[in-house]
């Protein structure tokens, strides 16, 4: 578990502090940006504790908002880089950290859309800890894992049903594209639930914590984008057999069957029954020249 330094705790934001800050900045949380601010100090300290950080970790936080989780992170680690898309929030956050954060820590804020983010200042990040905006949680998580291979672990808070999809095993009702693509990068598991009342405004859904640990990608001669294109095709028609669902991907049903058999996969199964390693093997046997127009070549 992350060690909180009791001798120099931050002054965390209370529910009243969050509302006062929002009023002063004329901020109203918007559905467009998926904003729901955490207003409970016990919740943010719990998130940091479950994240299992060390002081040496370099943490990247996406969507810091008014800084509730940021301040709790700075109790446990020496450096946090926050990525915020809202210019008003991004401009205010350094002042909040300066006034309330643990002395001697390093903090930077990057004004950017996390999905478009290409680089971060300073040392490579080792952990992602974030209350991700509900409406872009999956693309943000996958983008961060793809662009920052130095991320070895993380804990994200997302809508509960999204959490279920991220950690779902093959064959389960919620298993799908997010499950497979997350598994390409990391092993993921549910790490708890978070009730609506700890947020402002109070959402109509529960939230869930998902922890992940980086692992090597499956062995394959296909690139990541080639595997992901296959996954998208397999789940676009998830009730069909792979022979039928992958006809467009392979060029024909017969070509799809040939690729599946070469990979040791029964053509009559559905995509929801396969793990990420299975998809990696199938992608390596895609018939030559079958790539659709405009589809990018694979990347490791």
Swiss-Prot record:
Its EC number is 2.1.1.182. InterPro entries: KsgA/Erm, rRNA_Ade_diMease-like_C, rRNA_Ade_Mease_Trfase_CS, rRNA_Ade_methylase_Trfase_N, rRNA_adenine_dimethylase, SAM-dependent_MTases_sf. It catalyses: adenosine(1518)/adenosine(1519) in 16S rRNA + 4 S-adenosyl-L-methionine = N(6)-dimethyladenosine(1518)/N(6)-dimethyladenosine(1519) in 16S rRNA + 4 S-adenosyl-L-homocysteine + 4 H(+). GO terms for cellular component: cytosol. It is an enzyme of class 2 (transferase). It comes from the Bacteria. S-adenosyl-L-methionine binds at residues 36, 38, 63, 84, 113, 131. It is found in: Cytoplasm. Its main location: cytoplasm. GO terms for molecular function: 16S rRNA (adenine(1518)-N(6)/adenine(1519)-N(6))-dimethyltransferase activity; RNA binding. Keywords: Cytoplasm, Methyltransferase, RNA-binding, rRNA processing, S-adenosyl-L-methionine, Transferase. Disulfide bonds: none annotated. Pfam families: RrnaAD. Specifically dimethylates two adjacent adenosines (A1518 and A1519) in the loop of a conserved hairpin near the 3'-end of 16S rRNA in the 30S particle. May play a critical role in biogenesis of 30S subunits. Belongs to the class I-like SAM-binding methyltransferase superfamily. rRNA adenine N(6)-methyltransferase family. RsmA subfamily. This is Ribosomal RNA small subunit methyltransferase A. It comes from Kineococcus radiotolerans (strain ATCC BAA-149 / DSM 14245 / SRS30216). The gene is rsmA.
């Amino acid at each position: 578990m992350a060690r909180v330094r009791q001798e120099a705790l931050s002054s965390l934001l209370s529910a009243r502090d969050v509302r006062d800050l929002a009023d002063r900045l004329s901020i109203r949380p918007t559905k467009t940006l998926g904003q729901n601010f955490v207003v409970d100090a016990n919740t943010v300290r719990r998130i940091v504790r479950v994240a299992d950080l060390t002081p040496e970790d370099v943490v990247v936080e996406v969507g810091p908002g008014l800084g509730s989780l940021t301040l709790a992170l700075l109790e446990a680690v020496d450096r946090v880089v926050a990525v915020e898309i809202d210019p008003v929030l991004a401009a205010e956050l350094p002042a909040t950290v300066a006034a309330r954060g643990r002395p001697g820590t390093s903090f930077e804020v990057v004004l950017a859309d996390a999905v478009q983010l290409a680089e971060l200042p300073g040392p490579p990040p080792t952990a992602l800890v974030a209350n991700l905006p509900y409406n872009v949680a999956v693309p943000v998580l996958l983008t961060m894992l793809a662009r920052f291979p130095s991320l070895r672990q993380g804990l994200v808070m997302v809508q509960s049903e999204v959490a279920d999809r991220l950690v779902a095993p093959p064959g389960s009702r919620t298993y799908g594209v997010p499950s497979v693509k997350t598994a390409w990068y990391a092993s993921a598991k549910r790490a708890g639930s978070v009730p609506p009342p700890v947020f402002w405004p109070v959402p109509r859904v529960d939230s869930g914590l998902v922890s992940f640990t980086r692992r090597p990608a499956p062995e394959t001669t296909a690139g990541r984008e080639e595997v992901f294109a296959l996954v998208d095709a397999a789940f676009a028609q998830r009730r069909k057999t792979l022979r039928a669902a992958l006809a467009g991907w392979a060029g024909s049903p017969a070509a799809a069957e040939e690729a599946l058999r070469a990979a040791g996969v029964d053509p009559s199964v559905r995509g929801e029954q396969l793990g990420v390693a299975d998809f990696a093997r199938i992608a390596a046997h895609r018939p030559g020249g079958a790539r659709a127009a405009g589809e990018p070549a694979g990347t490791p």
